[in-house]
């Protein structure tokens, strides 16, 4: 605690203290573009050394909750620039969290009301997302049945993340955090229960982690590895995630792979509220 309020160098980024505000989904952006109220919200919290934003969908397809601000077009850049300027004016630093929910979405949120996408076709049933109910009102609904991505579509999503990372830096962010936790699209590919693919993104641990690692590498190439972080929730059970065969080996392999990449940081989220999954020693 004696060092909590002392400066810290985060991969070349000077933080005024070691307090970090974790990302929190707010669903307060009615037109999906951040406004002055969003800027005020983050500026009020800029006394922390580092802020991590709420999840920002990298595409319309990646959205799983109403009123979440995106980062995939020029209008988003203009809106988020107000936020970064407000935070920097208070001496704060801020990373943008890049997000694709995969199967954790609903047809009412998808372009053309089509099925959300995932590694496979297993529906998340013991959970809800914030979308439009049958009456057209905002509320909790069970995620829709997903469809499995084609191989070329997986690569397109990787490109979406890289594009959004570039836009985030253009908007003035100090870096980006890839959301690979909490049962969203990367968790869906890592799970051998959900990922039954037979292409280069399914089967072995090496193949199931390929999507995440290719995305990390693409984002790092786009904006520089010192501006890139990743959030993981090993052995998480939130959003209808279940144990799967080879789970220990999967997370061990991810750890080894990340150790070879000089990222800004790795953000781990432990979910004791949601699960009592046994964790391996160490």
Residue ranges and their predicted role:
Residues 1-282:
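Flavin-dependent oxidoreductase catalytic cores
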